[in-house]
Amino acid sequence: MPETKQTEDSGASAAEQVIEAARRNNVDLLNSIYESYASKPDQLISLLNSAKDATGNSALHLCCKYGNYEVMDNILDLEGVNVNPQHPLTLDTPLHYAVNYSFEEPDYALFLIENLIEVGADVKLKNKDGLKPVQLLGDSNEKIRDTLESAEYAINVKPEAEGEVVEDLDSDDDAK
C-alpha cells in the first residue's frame, strides 16, 4: 500500500499531491513526488495506481478530463502504471475521458488518445453504459475515430504471418 502520510511541506499526502499534479498539470509537483520515491520505484508505481480523488478518478482520468498532457506523458513514461483504471461508478477509463475531452479540444485529445493507445490502453473496454470509447464520439472527429478503430483492428487481427482474424469487431451490423 502506498504511503499516505502527510508531507511536511504541503500538508497533503503523497496521493493527494499526485491527484493535484494531475488536476493542475503541475509537472514540478509530480517531479518532486518522483524524487521523494527515487529509491522506492515499486512504491511510486503503487502510489500512482492507487491515488484517487474524492469521486474515484485516478491521476490518468484527471489528466484526460482536463487535457493535461504534460503530467500524463510523465506518468505514462513509467513502467507498471495501470493505463486502464476504470472509474468505480461509471467504469470509464482514461481513454473514455480523453474521447469526451475531444469535444472541447480535439487536437489535444487526439494527442492524449494516441499516447494512451501507444502504451497499451484497451480501446475495447466498455463503461457501465456498455460503450467503448469510440462509441462516445457520435458523428464527430474522424481522426479520433480512425485512431480508435485502427487500434481496435490491430487488437483483433493476429500478426500478418498468421493472417487470420482472432475475433470479429464489435459493431452494430452484427445484429442485422
Language model: regions and residue ranges:
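Extreme N-terminal segments of fungal proteins
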Residues: 1-49, 57, 65
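Ankyrin-repeat-protein effector appendages
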Residues: 1-20, 118-119, 128-176
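Ankyrin-repeat boundary/"N-cap" motif
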Residues: 10-18, 45-59, 85-102, 126-135
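Ankyrin repeat domain, specifically the short helix-to-loop turn at the C-terminus of the second helix
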Residues: 3, 34-49, 73-83, 111-122, ...
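Conserved ankyrin/ankyrin-like repeat signature
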Residues: 29, 70-71, 108-112, 143-144
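Acidic (E/D-rich), amphipathic helical modules within compact regulatory domains
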Residues: 50-79
